[in-house]
Structures are given as C-alpha cells and as structure tokens.
Amino acid sequence: MAVFHAFRALRPTPEKTDLYDERVYEKAKENLDNMEEKGILVQDQKACYYIYELVRKGKTQTGIVGCSSIDDYMNGVVKKHELTREDKEQDRIHHVDSCNANTGPIFLACRYPDSLLTLMNNWKDHHEAAYDFTEEDQITHRVWVIDEDEVISEINKEFAGIDFLYIADGHHRAASAVKVGLKRREQNPGYTGEEEFNYFLSVVFPYDQLCILPYNRIVKDLNGLTVKAFLGALKFNFELMLMPGFPCKPVEKHCMGMYVDGQWYHLKAWPDIYEKKDVVGQLDVSILQEKVLRPVLGIEDPRTDQR
C-alpha cells in the first residue's frame, strides 16, 4: 500500500521574479527565506493535492503532486532502479538539511486506476488552473489545486490501493530527503510519523504517459588506449557502425550511440554477451557497465570514479 499525503505547498505568485562551499548552501537558504518574506512563495492555508500537467511537442503528461512516506522508500513500496553517486547524494543532503525543504519533487510513476484518472480529469474540467504558462523551452506547465476535503480523502484511498511506486527520476533527491528525514527522527525521538520530515515531495504520473529520455555517460579519457585500440576492444561485444555527420540516438534495446574522437558510432550488443534470463544484466545500462566501462575503461564504480 502506497502512503501518499496532501501538503501545504509554498507556491510562487504569478509574477516572475567552489559548488560545495558552505556559503552555497547558506545562500540557498537565504534565497528561500527571501522568497517567502517577499510573498513570491506563499504557503497554502491547508494541506492540498495538486494536479501537475506538462505539454511538450504535443504530448501531455498529467500527475498528482503530494508527499511520499520515507518508510515506503525504506520498505520497498517506492521502487528504486539505480545506484546513487556519493558526492551528489551528500550535496543534496546538505542542501535539503540547510533549506529545511524539498526544493524539487521526486518523479514517480505507477499504474493509475481508471477511477483516479477520472477524478483528475473531472477536477480539471470543472476548475480553473492556478498556473498556466509556457516556458522558453516550449514546455507548457499547468497546476490545479485540489483543496476539497472529500476529494482529498478519495485520493488518499486511491493511493492506498496502489501497491508500488517507481522512481522515474530523482534517485539522489529521494535518497537525500530520506536521510535527512532519518536525521530529524534521531533529533526528535518522540516523533509520531506525521511530521513533515517523514515525507518527501513527489509527483506521481501514470506510467503509460511517460516519455523516456536519454541518460548519457561522459568519460574523461580512454584509460590509456588509442582510439583504434578502444574501438577494437568494443568489437568483441558490439557491432560497430560509423554514423558520420549527426548524433546517433538508439531506437531499440541493446543499442547505444557513442561519440569519440569527433565521430559518432552506433553500437549494437551481440546477443550472446548477456543472459536472457537475467532481468538486470540485460539492461542497456548494465551492458554498458559490464562490457565497456569496467573491462575496457577501468571504471569499477561509476558512483565514485572521478573520470
């Protein structure tokens, strides 16, 4: 059962208005405080849910914004699918701890019940969006505030019937928010579980509305190899094709685009290099790590390797 809570958002008014140095985190806290003091961010009077809709290149993605339980994260109701980098995680822990706020939501996905989709659409049809604007990147953002107690209660019941939520983006933000929450629990041994630090900001989208974007890796060097030797090593596990003149984006599983020495290449993994029954091992990210990054480029742990 997924525990999802309404919350009182700090919402922007319509008017627009060394990386790890301690002063960076202090400045973030100062900026947040200033936005509250100036009324740029205004906290709603009661805990609400929010419908968040994005429209990009004709594709619409609509989800519900609320707060997810850190206990759900720890007990596996919120499913993770990638490891985090220690340096990025520590940076975000410091940021959340300093601001005492989740400044960005975790992007979650699940199978939406038809009844929850109907509820969202009905609310949109009968209420005006609190925000409706298009950014310079041509992505349109719309937000509706769900503030009626009866509807909030219905959403609570809908999420109680959902077995799992999956992190689509925000593994570092989620891990950091959870660790700060656990720290707050240590500081407040009499906590009830209802305090805000027991939850992290999330937006849950229907899985079938998601658009998968590339997640690229940049490696600083070829581990002492020449370009010719590097390409030769890849041919043991991949079919290589030179793709002159334009970026190569994969269009099917077990294919990758690679840019090296000013040239684009299309890589297709030979079918005998991964075990068909190994669900994790046949993921493209696993093939990249086990057949390229580790054996050829000498990168044992991408989480900590500075290259």
Regions found by a protein language model. Give the residues of each.
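Surface-exposed, charge/polar-rich loops and edge strands
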Residues: M1-R307
